A protein has these predicted regions:
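Hydrophobic structural segments
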Residues: 3-219
Length: 219
C-alpha cells in the first residue's frame, strides 16, 4: 500500500487548540498562561495535571510524553535561576514542554467554573460578572446543610461563613474568590462557594448577608 505521511503535532498547535476553547487573552493580567516551555517541539504524548511538580515531570518521562498540560502555571514568579531538582529545571533537562491554562480555563464555557457549578448540582448555570458563575439548587437549604452538601459533593473539607439566611441561588468561583464575592452578591446569590478566601473578605461578605463556603484550593 501507499505510505501515508502524518505530520507531527507541535506544542504550539496543541496550545492553539486549547486557546480556541479557553482563549489565552481571557486570562487575568497577573496570570502566566500559554506555552511556558518548548513551543516548536513535536508532541509524542501529553500528560494532563493540576500542578507540574517534579514527580509529574518524572511521570511524563516514564510515559514518553513530550508535553505536559497543567492548570496552575509551572512558572509564576520570575525565575532568576534554574535550580536542580525543581520542575522547571527538570522540564528543561528532559526537553518536555509545558502548556498552562489557568484563569482563562476557569472562565471558559465548560471550564473549571462551570465544572464546579455542575458538581454542586446547580441548574440554570450562567456567568455573572467577570469571573463568577451562578446557578440554582434543587431545593432550599440552610447554611449548615448547604456546607455539608458542598463538602460531600467535592470531597474536601470546607469552612462555613454563615450569614444565617436560607440558600437557593449560589455563586461559584474556582480558585481564590476573595473580593469576587461581590459579583455573587450583585447577582442576588444567597451563597458563594470558592476554593480560597481571605478572612476579611469573608467577614465583609457575611456582613452583606452572603453565606460563604470555602474549600481547599491546594488539594
Amino acid at each position: 500500500g501507499a505510505e501515508v505521511s502524518v505530520e507531527m503535532v507541535t506544542v504550539q498547535q496543541l496550545a492553539d487548540v486549547l486557546g480556541r476553547w479557553a482563549p489565552w487573552d481571557d486570562a487575568e493580567q497577573w496570570d502566566n498562561v500559554g506555552v511556558l516551555a518548548g513551543a516548536a517541539a513535536p508532541v509524542s504524548g501529553v500528560l494532563c495535571t493540576l500542578d507540574i511538580t517534579p514527580a509529574v515531570v518524572h511521570e511524563a518521562v516514564r510515559r514518553g510524553c513530550s508535553a505536559v498540560v497543567s492548570h496552575h502555571p509551572v512558572i509564576f514568579s520570575p525565575l532568576k535561576a534554574l535550580v536542580p531538582g525543581t520542575a522547571p529545571y527538570l522540564l528543561a533537562r528532559h526537553g518536555i514542554a509545558a502548556v498552562c491554562a489557568h484563569t482563562n480555563l476557569d472562565k471558559a464555557p465548560g471550564g473549571v467554573g462551570d465544572a464546579l457549578a455542575t458538581a454542586l448540582g446547580l441548574s440554570g448555570i450562567e456567568p455573572c460578572g467577570s469571573y463568577c458563575r451562578r446557578g440554582t439548587l434543587p431545593h432550599e437549604m440552610m447554611p449548615r446543610g448547604f456546607a455539608a452538601h458542598v463538602q460531600a459533593a467535592l470531597g474536601v473539607p470546607v469552612r462555613l461563613v454563615d450569614a444565617g439566611a436560607p440558600v437557593r441561588t449560589v455563586g461559584v468561583v474556582s480558585g481564590a474568590g476573595d473580593e469576587l464575592w461581590a459579583e455573587a452578591k450583585a447577582a442576588a446569590c444567597d451563597a458563594f462557594v470558592t476554593g480560597e478566601m481571605g478572612h476579611h473578605h469573608a467577614l465583609d461578605a457575611r456582613e452583606a448577608g452572603l453565606t460563604c463556603v470555602v474549600g481547599t484550593h491546594h488539594r
